[in-house]
A protein has these predicted regions:
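Short linear motifs embedded in intrinsically disordered, charge-biased segments
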Residues: 1-137
Length: 137
């Protein structure tokens, strides 16, 4: 990121609510770009959540040694957990896909599955439709 962004986030004179707003409007959209199409694994969501919390702690001026709860930091900055936003984005995209006509290219790429394709050994990869079904539960 540009040094000017870090200057805003590190400056102690900038109110924390404003830092949270800045985070929600610039940094989080960059992290979530294209996330509606990802069939994410728990490990990926966990890694991104850890990176997000590290950044939020840094914005507040706290470290892990300060033993401040994650929920308290999120409340101070007015930020919701990454996983909730990821589910929102995925379900919003699912609504767009559902409203498209059946001959639209998005239907052939996402919702159709080739049953005659041989899959490799091991656990089958999570598909986008399976991720949506998990979000709807």
């Amino acid at each position: 990121m540009a040094p000017s962004i870090w200057g805003v986030l590190c400056d102690k004179r900038v109110p924390q609510k404003l830092k949270g707003k800045f985070y929600r409007t610039t940094i989080r959209p960059a992290m979530l770009y294209g996330a509606e199409c990802w069939p994410t694994k728990r490990r990926h969501v966990q890694q991104i959540s850890v990176a997000e919390m590290r950044m939020l702690r840094w914005i507040c001026g706290h470290t892990r040694r300060d033993r401040v709860r994650n929920d308290d930091i999120r409340d101070r900055l007015g930020v919701t957990p990454f996983e909730e936003k990821l589910v929102q984005h995925r379900l919003r995209w699912f609504g767009h896909v559902q409203r498209r006509p059946l001959e639209a290219p998005v239907h052939s790429g996402i919702l159709s599955q080739d049953s005659n394709v041989k899959r490799g050994r091991g656990r089958p990869k999570l598909t986008w439709v399976e991720a949506i079904n998990g979000d709807l539960k």
